Amino acid sequence: PSTNETVEIGSKARIGNGLLTAALFQTDTDNEIVVDASSGGRTSYKNAGKTRRQGMELGLDQQFGESWRLKAAWTWLDATYRTNVCDDTSCKGNRIPGIARNMGYASFGYQPEKGWYAGSDIRYMSDIMANDENTAKAPSWTVVGLTTGYKWSYGKMDMDLFGRVDNLFDRSYAGSV
């Protein structure tokens, strides 16, 4: 079986009409199940021995006036093999494929409780390794989105009609490997 040991410490602070959060964490896993090979729609798995994920998360949720809101989050994550999982070479210390080291998100919008609302957001993911040997990787990417909608009450029901455009500038990116 796969087992985990996790340690996390965090803090939250109210700043005016906002909330700032921060956390440090570390998870050590024994016998983690990871992808061995994936081809033609078929995927096989293997046990990776020991792995470690350690990092930090920062978040901000800030309200301006009655209806303007800014949200932001950043994660730094170091996910590595602690034992060798490769056949011919040593992969100990290599990054685990498919996991970005840095991920960020920010949004800003007009969000009243009722009526029209609108906002935009931006998402970032740093490069991700595509194999255990760390010889191939998918590049980092950034995409922008827009949201708009209308909120109202109909009897006892709250209604929300909305539309969203993801990847506004039609960027090509690899979402997974």
Protein language model features and the residues they cover:
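Conserved C-terminal beta-signal and adjacent last beta-strands/turns
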Residues: V7, Q63, R95-V177
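Short alpha-helix boundary/capping motifs
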Residues: A37-S39, C86-D88, A136, G149
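Membrane-embedded beta-barrel scaffold of Gram-negative outer-membrane proteins
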Residues: S2-E66, T75-T83, L161, D166, ...
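Gram-negative outer-membrane beta-barrel transporters
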Residues: Q26-D28, K46-N131
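Glycine-rich loops and low-complexity Gly/Arg-rich segments
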Residues: T3, D36, Y45-G49, L70, ...
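Secondary-structure boundary/capping signal
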Residues: N17-L19, W68, W116, K156
